[in-house]
């Protein structure tokens, strides 16, 4: 009876809205796709897609399983990032070797997102996220000196990919597409802004830069915290 009543925007709404807005820049290419995985019923799915149309949110794919687990379908949909407001679901996905991200409230209502600002801003942690945890293990086992020695020795060797590497490389590919659009426009503003945050400090940044170049990523911001808390 409520199928025509729009659902309220969730915690991931602003991110998803800006992500899908990027597709408008490239027509049929559609570099980004969003899939909804829900344990709700297909009837609820009907209301969900009606809500998407209400908010002009072009989500086209989904699975509604009436109480059954949706995890078996993550790989079926070839998902590069599984997002959920449920921390336990995210942790389970990660334990299954799937790329997961926990969406937490920002303290700002989704509808308050600036509709005139379409730039998508994403900050990535480096170690254990973009790359594997080799360097982190070295730090835990051999201390800072061992970690620095490893990174300096392998300064020209890219790191092994981490859990979000696939998503990261897709964003890098989008950056190249976006750069082509602004090639002849000196006032063109990139549609996506990527920041890298890491506990590293010099000289271990050299291998980080090598890895980013190998992945084709042009980060707008790089924060080398040298051990300072990332929460700052």
Stretch-by-stretch model annotation:
Residues 51-55, 71-111, 117, 130, ...:
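Hydrophobic, ordered structural segments
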Residues 44-45, 70-71, 89-91, 204-205, ...:
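Short, well-ordered alpha-helical microsegments
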Residues 82, 122-124:
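Residue-level marker for buried hydrophobic side chains located in beta-strands
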Residues 1-68, 116-118, 125-224:
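Alpha-helical substrate-recognition element adjacent to the catalytic core
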Residues 65-71, 108, 226-232:
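Short acidic loop-to-helix transition motifs that present clustered carboxylates
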Residues 72, 76-77, 217, 226-227:
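Short, solvent-exposed interaction modules
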């Amino acid at each position: 009876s409520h199928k025509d009543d729009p659902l309220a925007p969730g915690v991931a709404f602003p991110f998803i809205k800006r992500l899908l807005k990027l597709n408008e820049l490239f027509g049929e290419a559609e570099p980004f796709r969003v899939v909804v995985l829900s344990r709700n019923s297909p009837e609820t799915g009907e209301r969900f897609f009606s809500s998407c149309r209400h908010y002009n949110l072009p989500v086209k794919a989904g699975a509604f399983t009436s109480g059954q687990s949706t995890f078996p379908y993550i790989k079926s949909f070839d998902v590069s990032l599984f997002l959920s407001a449920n921390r336990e679901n995210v942790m389970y996905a990660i334990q299954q070797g799937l790329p997961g991200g926990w969406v937490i409230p920002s303290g700002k209502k989704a509808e308050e997102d600036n509709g005139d600002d379409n730039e998508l801003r994403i900050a990535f942690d480096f170690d254990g996220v973009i790359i594997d945890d080799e360097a982190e293990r070295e730090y835990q086992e051999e201390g800072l000196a061992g970690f620095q020695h490893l990174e300096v020795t392998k300064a020209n060797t890219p790191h092994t990919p981490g859990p979000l590497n696939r998503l990261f490389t897709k964003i890098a590919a989008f950056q190249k597409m976006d750069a082509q659009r602004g090639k002849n426009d000196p006032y063109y503003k990139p549609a996506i802004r990527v920041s890298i945050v890491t506990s590293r400090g010099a000289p271990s940044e050299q291998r980080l830069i090598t890895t980013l170049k190998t992945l084709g990523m042009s980060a707008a911001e790089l924060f080398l915290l040298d051990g300072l808390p990332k929460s700052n």
